C-alpha cells in the first residue's frame, strides 16, 4: 500500500474526540454484551456500562434475552449496582420500591394510586434493543437500530462450523488497561510485534503467515496457521481437548482472529473460543472482559482441563495490555508525531478509516492532516 500514517495524538487523548466516539460509534452500533449461557436462568442478568449508559441484560428462562436501561422510571435511581446476579422474579428500585417484572412492566408503585390519572402501564423500564447471534448477546443503544445481521455481514456463515452457541464459559478475567480503547483493537490486528512481545505466542504461530480477509465497515480479521507440531494455542502447544465437532481438518490447523467493531475481539481455536469485550472508560482507560469457552462434552469429561489455554492467553493478554499502556504514554507525550504503517498493518489503516468515517463523517481531513507527517521529526505532538 502507499505510505500511510498513524492517527494524530488527539484521537487518543482528547475528551471531545472520545465523546464523539462514544456518541457516534458506541451509542449507534451493536455491542457484544455477554453470552446467553451467562443469563440462561430466568431473571439472571449481566450489567454493562458504556457511552454514558448502564444496561441490564436479562434472561427470560426460555433461551432468550431482554435489555433495559438500569434506571428507575420514578426519579431516575440506578436499579442495580452489581455486575451480575439473578433477579428473583422482579426488579425493585432500592429507593422508593418501584417494582418491575422481568419484561420491564411496572407492577408496583407505592402510594402512586393516590395520583389522579396515574397508570402503571405508562411507566415500563426503558427498553434497549437486544439480539443474539450464536450465543453472543448484543445490545444497541440507538432508538432505531438496523438489524444485527447487517452489522455482522457474512460472519454468521463464515463461523457456522464452530457452532459457537453450543460452547460454554469456563473462565473469566477482567483487566483495567491505562490505554485508549483503539490501541487495544490495533494491537489485536497485527502480529509484527509477536517476536518481540510474545515469546510464547511466537513459538506457536507463523506470525508472517496471516491470511486476512478484506475489511468491511464493521469488522476486520483473518486466520493464522499453527506451526508444525502445534495443535492449539496452549502453554505447550498441545491440545488436551477434542477438536470442536463442526471443524474440518483445515480449520483444525488455524486460529481465527476477528475484530467485530466496535467492542468485540473474537478468537476461534480448534478446541475453544476466546472472547474479549471492550468497555472504554475514558480516553486513556479501558476495561476489558476476557472469557474462555469450551464445548460442554469436554467440560463434563473426566480429566477435563482448561488451565493450559487460560494461562496461555492470560500471559499473552497481559503482554499486550502492557505494551498498549506504553503506547498510550508515548502518544500522550510532546515527542509524538504520526509514524508510517508497514504493508502488514493494512488492517490498522482500515480500522482508522472506520473510526474517522463513523465519528466525524469525513475522511478528507485524515488524508490532509497525516498524509505527510513522516518528515516532521523533532516537532511536538500534532494535536
Give the location of each predicted region:
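Short, contiguous pre-domain boundary segments
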Residues: 1-9, 165
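Non-catalytic accessory segments flanking enzyme active sites
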Residues: 7-50
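Short Pro/Gly-enriched beta-strand edge/turn motifs at strand-loop
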Residues: 28-38, 109-114, 257-262
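Short clusters of hydrophobic/aromatic residues that line enzyme substrate/ligand-binding pockets
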Residues: 33, 79, 106, 201, ...
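Rieske [2Fe-2S] iron-sulfur-binding domain
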Residues: 38-143, 149-157
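C-terminal catalytic domain of Rieske-type non-heme iron oxygenases
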Residues: 40, 58-59, 64, 70, ...
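Small-residue-biased low-complexity repeat regions
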Residues: 361-365, 371-380
Amino acid at each position: 500500500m502507499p505510505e500511510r500514517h498513524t492517527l494524530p495524538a488527539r484521537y487518543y487523548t482528547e475528551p471531545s474526540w472520545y465523546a464523539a466516539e462514544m456518541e457516534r460509534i458506541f451509542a449507534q452500533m451493536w455491542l457484544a454484551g455477554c453470552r446467553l449461557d451467562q443469563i440462561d436462568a430466568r431473571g439472571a442478568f449481566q450489567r454493562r456500562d458504556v457511552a454514558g449508559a448502564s444496561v441490564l441484560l436479562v434472561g427470560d428462562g426460555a433461551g432468550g434475552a431482554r435489555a433495559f436501561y438500569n434506571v428507575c422510571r420514578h426519579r431516575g435511581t440506578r436499579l442495580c449496582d452489581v455486575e451480575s446476579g439473578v433477579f428473583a422474579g422482579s426488579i425493585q428500585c432500592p429507593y422508593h420500591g418501584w417494582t418491575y417484572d422481568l419484561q420491564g412492566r411496572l407492577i408496583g408503585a407505592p402510594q402512586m394510586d393516590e395520583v389522579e390519572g396515574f397508570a402503571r402501564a405508562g411507566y415500563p423500564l426503558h427498553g434497549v434493543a437486544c439480539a443474539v447471534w450464536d450465543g453472543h448477546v448484543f445490545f444497541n443503544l440507538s432508538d432505531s437500530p438496523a438489524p444485527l445481521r447487517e452489522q455482522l455481514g457474512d460472519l454468521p456463515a463464515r463461523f457456522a462450523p464452530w457452532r459457537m452457541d453450543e460452547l460454554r464459559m469456563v473462565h473469566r478475567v477482567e483487566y483495567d488497561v491505562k490505554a485508549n480503547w483503539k490501541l487495544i483493537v490495533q494491537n489485536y490486528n497485527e502480529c509484527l510485534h509477536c517476536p518481540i512481545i510474545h515469546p510464547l505466542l511466537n513459538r506457536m504461530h507463523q506470525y508472517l503467515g496471516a491470511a486476512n480477509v478484506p475489511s468491511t465497515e464493521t469488522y476486520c480479521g483473518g486466520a493464522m496457521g499453527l506451526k508444525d507440531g502445534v495443535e492449539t494455542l496452549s502453554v505447550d502447544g498441545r491440545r488436551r481437548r477434542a477438536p470442536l465437532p463442526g471443524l474440518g481438518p483445515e480449520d483444525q490447523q488455524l486460529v481465527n482472529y476477528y475484530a467485530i467493531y466496535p467492542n468485540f475481539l473474537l478468537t476461534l481455536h480448534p478446541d475453544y473460543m476466546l472472547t474479549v469485550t471492550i468497555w472504554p472508560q475514558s480516553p486513556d482507560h479501558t476495561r476489558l472482559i476476557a472469557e474462555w469457552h469450551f464445548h460442554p462434552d469436554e467440560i463434563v469429561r473426566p480429566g477435563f482441563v482448561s488451565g493450559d489455554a487460560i494461562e496461555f492467553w492470560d500471559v499473552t493478554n497481559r503482554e499486550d495490555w502492557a505494551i498498549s499502556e506504553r503506547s498510550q504514554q508515548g502518544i500522550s507525550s510532546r515527542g509524538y508525531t504520526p509514524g508510517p504503517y508497514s504493508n502488514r498493518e493494512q488492517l490498522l489503516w482500515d480500522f482508522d478509516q472506520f473510526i474517522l468515517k463513523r465519528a466525524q463523517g469525513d475522511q478528507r481531513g485524515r488524508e490532509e492532516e497525516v498524509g505527510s507527517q513522516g518528515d516532521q521529526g523533532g516537532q511536538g505532538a500534532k494535536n
